[in-house]
Amino acid sequence: MKQRQFFGTDGIRGKVGAGKMTPELALKLGWAAGRVLSRAGTHKVIIGKDTRISGYLFESALEAGLSAAGLDVMLIGPMPTPAVAYLTRTFRAEAGIVISASHNPYYDNGIKFFYTDGSKLEDAVELEIEAELEKPLTCVESHLLGKVGRIDDAAGRYIEYCKSHFPAEQTLSGLKIVVDCAHGATYHIAPSVFKELGAEVIAIGDKPNGLNINDKVGATSMAKICETVLEENADLGIALDGDGDRIMMVNRHGRVIDGDEILYILACDAQKRGVLQGGVVGTLMSNLGLDLALQALDIPFVRSKVGDRYVMELLKEHDWKIGGENSGHILNLDHGTTGDGIVAGILVLAAMCRQSASLEELTAGITMLPQVLVNVRFEGADDPLSSEVVLAAKAEVEQKLGARGRVLLRKSGTEPLLRVMVEGDDRADVTQFANDIADAVRNLV
């Protein structure tokens, strides 16, 4: 299959005003996507965005391109990515578009697409859109132009949707929860959800200004929420990323509970209730500790390529329900078609209530092995995955680790980075091994 030039593992992403993320490309992309989607019978598209200041720019450009292709557009403003997926289904739109760079800084942005069922586009469809980008932009006749409207009650609809995943007979009364919204798309959603379910909520990262999304807050910057949980003597913390599709948690002692441990909690809870269908899908980055803990419970575990779209593919292939990434993308196909940080948090809280257990107790059966991830820029260098020097460094580390460790080298799908992951029993050794491989990559430049 031909390689994609614009789409990465999660849509199109980059620095605003440079490369892929320009207003000109967004206009053309809206038109190209509109042409491809219209051939499949699409007539209506929903557009949501996060809180980046550039969201206004790309929203207008996409809107114009889609209209030029003859598609109607419904705008919902700042809303989490999973909310766009949900609203795309409930409004019977044929596609949804999210303007977000997820956990990246404010000066980046991105564009990703959903089908009518809320699932992401396949690679083949993205290639069709890229083929249209090579053609000159045209416009349908005036009477065929798409119309544009706005959904004013989108936030309220999504809040009720999130709450519907919590058992009606349960309440969060008596729990104090710190909720970190990353100054992102969940700022007006997540605190309300958990308050309305009965919890005492302390919100942080809930004051976006267009420039502060993911800035020292959120699921990729956990120091602030860990500190706040301890200061407030809270029962737990829930950290979301800029577009609300990933979650990390914090127990009452200020320890981070990552996506692997959340998967373990959900799988154990489903098994206890007799509703676990098959096993669990993780990724190449999932901690070996998750694999071992699930083995102890006779729960099958398989690994996909990195990216929640590939987790979804394996879930469908095996007809399983639960999967995700250690970075906090959690999928439970009984509760939605895409990763949803708020809903994943609700499912963990439901398990706590059902079992009258704390986060510490729910994670007692899993021991995470030390895992170190080093990101190394290689822009302008030779392909590090083809370098004999880098491969030799990797082989040397693997020999030292033996059966109790792993090494994974993976290129980022959105940035010129090589991700060096090393896992083993001793953190000091693992850190040194990861840095040894990273140094081999740096020496290529």
UniProtKB/Swiss-Prot annotation:
It catalyses: alpha-D-glucosamine 1-phosphate = D-glucosamine 6-phosphate. The modification Phosphoserine is found at residue 102. The active site is at 102 (phosphoserine intermediate). Keywords: Isomerase, Magnesium, Metal-binding, Phosphoprotein. It comes from the Bacteria. It is an enzyme of class 5 (isomerase). Its cofactor is Mg(2+). Mg(2+) binds at residues 102, 241, 243, 245. One of its GO terms (cellular component) is cytosol. GO terms for biological process: carbohydrate metabolic process; peptidoglycan biosynthetic process; UDP-N-acetylglucosamine biosynthetic process. The keyword Metal-binding applies. It holds the Pfam family PGM_PMM_III. Coiled coil: none annotated. Activated by phosphorylation. Its EC number is 5.4.2.10. One of its GO terms (molecular function) is phosphomannomutase activity. InterPro entries: A-D-PHexomutase_a/b/a-I (IPR005844), A-D-PHexomutase_a/b/a-I/II/III (IPR016055), A-D-PHexomutase_a/b/a-II (IPR005845), A-D-PHexomutase_a/b/a-III (IPR005846), A-D-PHexomutase_C (IPR005843), A-D-PHexomutase_C_sf (IPR036900), A-D-PHexomutase_CS (IPR016066), Alpha-D-phosphohexomutase_SF (IPR005841). Binds 1 Mg(2+) ion per subunit. PANTHER family: PHOSPHOGLUCOMUTASE (ALPHA-D-GLUCOSE-1,6-BISPHOSPHATE-DEPENDENT), PHOSPHOHEXOSE MUTASE. Catalyzes the conversion of glucosamine-6-phosphate to glucosamine-1-phosphate. Belongs to the phosphohexose mutase family. NCBIfam families: glmM (TIGR01455), PRK10887.1 (NF008139). This is Phosphoglucosamine mutase. The gene is glmM.
